[in-house]
């Protein structure tokens, strides 16, 4: 009989240890990524119970969330940040876990480090105490964000108890127009399906648009699956995947790589694969997209007006009014021209070398608008090194951007890079929740790195296509 299982179900079945009472499955986790924020309590649980790390060779630690991106001298000025750093250093030393520390050129944002080191591979199960672990699904792995108690479970047993989600195939046909990026694609999908649209599902992204994407673009898409409510998102491995992994430090070598590549490609969902749901979007219709509200589904194309309140259900209107009020915007207002105070290029969503190249192409020969603070924060030390080798740092600095060290930076309010008061930030990150970027009244507009660069130069939301 022909195997019609999609990739998700193949990988799930391969890693299933046993069925648990209550319907969950105990899954073996092939790669466990940890960082300084969600791991200390997990290691404390191990110490309290006299447990060890079951497979330290399947665990990688890095530091990213709380580290400053300007002055990185130890001890950090922030006492809590220094405490977290000291804790992960001690925990990794005591339990034999590999750590890419701040003085290691391999350090960076956890979801950028795993792929660039060749640790992330097709067919894996991957977990991390971080919401955006679904990034790794770009390689044809199934990757889950987990909580602290689950981090402890994996450290101790290398397994995780999970309920199997349904699988939805999201096909995007056609071809993206110039000035439309991977970030626009995922924002468009979330806008159409909603922040709860993926609850109970894993998303398989398929179609011509994803086939043409680079691995870095695919990572951007999979990264934000969680923002649409999905448990994870993935793209089937193909030759683009294989070519990206080959030669990376932790990738298989020689004949082992050839065997691995053949197996990776065999995992792809067959053409007649079974899915619980299928949805199709036309990539030709996707515009540069900007969020206007307080969740990632509240977005519009650059040439659209903000929605009219009457277009929402009665139940939804209260939340929309709240978003308009918080953002100080009005229904039927153009998104184009909304003033910004800060521009942030970086994060696990858009802090890779291709993101910096796209933004630098817009910044070159131009200058940040008066009164705008603009930051470029590479996603890893290796990305930073590559960008500097290409002269991108000089382009950004000449344009008035601050060139920073690697880290999570302004994506979240756990380090010194924060908004102040009612500042509005054009951001290439992944969440626009109230207070997400540090100020309880700060406002976030999500968009692609190129669109952030365009906004920084104009001093307001603008159409990057007019600068290309």
Please describe what each predicted stretch is.
Residues 1-468:
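Fe-S-dependent hydro-lyases/dehydratases of central metabolism
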């Amino acid at each position: 009989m022909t195997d019609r299982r999609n990739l998700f179900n193949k990988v799930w079945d391969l890693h299933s240890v046993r069925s648990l009472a209550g319907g969950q499955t105990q899954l073996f986790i092939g790669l466990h990524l940890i960082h300084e924020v969600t791991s200390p309590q997990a290691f404390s649980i191990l110490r309290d119970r006299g447990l060890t790390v079951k497979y330290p060779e399947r665990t990688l630690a890095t530091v990213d969330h709380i580290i400053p991106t300007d002055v990185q001298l130890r001890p950090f000025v922030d006492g809590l940040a220094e405490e977290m750093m000291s804790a992960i250093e001690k925990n990794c030393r005591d339990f034999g876990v590999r750590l890419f520390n701040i003085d290691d050129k391999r350090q960076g944002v956890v979801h950028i480090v795993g792929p660039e080191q060749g640790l992330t591979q097709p067919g894996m199960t991957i977990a991390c105490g971080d919401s955006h672990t679904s990034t790794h699904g770009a390689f044809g792995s199934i990757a889950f964000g987990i909580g602290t108690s689950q981090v402890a479970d994996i450290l101790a047993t290398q397994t995780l108890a999970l309920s199997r989600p349904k699988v939805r195939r999201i096909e995007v046909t056609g071809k993206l127009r110039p000035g439309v990026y991977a970030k626009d694609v995922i924002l468009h999908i979330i806008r159409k399906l909603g922040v709860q649209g993926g609850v109970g599902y894993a998303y398989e992204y398929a179609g011509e648009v994803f086939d043409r994407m680079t691995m870095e673009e695919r990572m951007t898409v999979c990264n934000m699956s969680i923002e649409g409510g999905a448990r994870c998102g993935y793209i089937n491995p193909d030759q683009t995947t294989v070519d990206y992994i080959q030669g990376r430090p932790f990738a298989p070598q020689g004949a082992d790589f050839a065997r691995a590549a053949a197996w990776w490609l065999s995992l792809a969902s067959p053409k007649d694969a079974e899915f619980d749901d299928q949805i199709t979007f036309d990539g030709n219709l996707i515009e540069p997209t900007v969020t206007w509200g307080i969740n990632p589904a509240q977005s519009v194309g650059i040439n659209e007006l903000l929605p009219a309140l009457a277009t929402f259900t009665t139940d939804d209107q209260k939340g929309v009014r709240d978003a308009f009020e918080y953002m100080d915007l009005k229904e039927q207002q153009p998104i184009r021209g909304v003033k910004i105070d800060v521009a942030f290029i970086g994060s696990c969503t858009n802090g890779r070398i291709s993101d910096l190249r796209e933004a630098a192409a817009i910044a070159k020969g131009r200058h940040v608008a008066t009164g705008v603070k603009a930051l470029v924060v590479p996603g890893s030390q290796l990305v930073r090194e590559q960008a500097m080798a290409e002269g991108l740092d000089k382009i950004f600095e000449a344009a008035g951007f601050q060139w920073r060290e690697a880290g999570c930076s302004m994506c979240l309010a756990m380090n010194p890079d924060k908004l102040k008061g009612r500042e509005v930030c054009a951001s290439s990150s992944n969440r626009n929740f109230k207070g997400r970027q540090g100020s309880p009244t700060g406002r976030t507009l999500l968009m692609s790195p190129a669109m952030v660069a365009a906004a920084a130069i104009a001093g307001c939301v603008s159409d990057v296509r007019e600068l290309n």
